[in-house]
Regions:
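Histidine- and aromatic-rich ligand-binding microenvironments
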Residues: 5, 35-36, 94-95, 117, ...
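Residues that scaffold the ATP/ADP-binding catalytic core of kinase and kinase-like folds
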Residues: 11-13, 46, 124
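Active-site neighborhoods of divalent-metal-dependent phosphate/nucleic-acid chemistry enzymes
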Residues: 70-116
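Anionic, Ser/Thr-rich low-complexity intrinsically disordered regions
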Residues: 71, 124, 131-132
Length: 133
């Protein structure tokens, strides 16, 4: 199973993205591709904020991802696990969000995380294979 990080989702959705082709391939070809609902919120935020995609189009694109990969909401237990792991591994600031993704990926049995930001997972997921497209 393969967890897809927000950067992969954004890159796959935007044809003008410089890494669109490899991100789209990761979305379409990854074995057992899945993500968490928090990554959908991050995707919407990135599309509307950084890329200035109109909200209606960003919502349609983001929610359309459900047709291409499994998406699951995060329970409180994942947040508790992530905060504890972040503290033990020295993860600080916004790194908690990558810790949250990593905790979820582990719980779901992922063997790998595909991301455009491998350094973000250096402390959060040293036990998982981290791939870039």
């Amino acid at each position: 199973m393969t967890f897809l990080d927000t950067g992969i989702l954004v890159g796959a959705l935007l044809e003008k993205h410089p890494e669109h082709a490899p991100c789209l391939e990761a979305l379409e070809e990854s074995e057992g591709a899945f993500t968490d609902a928090h990554a959908l919120a991050e995707t919407f935020a990135t599309l509307t904020g950084f890329y200035k995609v109109p909200a209606a189009a960003a919502a349609e694109l983001t929610l359309g991802l459900k047709a291409s990969l499994a998406v699951e909401a995060l329970p409180l237990a994942d947040y508790e696990t992530s905060i504890g792991e972040a503290q033990r591994r020295g993860v600080m600031g916004g790194g908690i969000y990558d810790s949250l993704h990593a905790s979820f990926a582990r719980r779901k049995g992922a063997r790998r995380i595909v991301t455009r930001n491998p350094s973000h997972f250096a402390h959060a997921a040293p036990d998982l294979e981290i791939l870039t497209p």
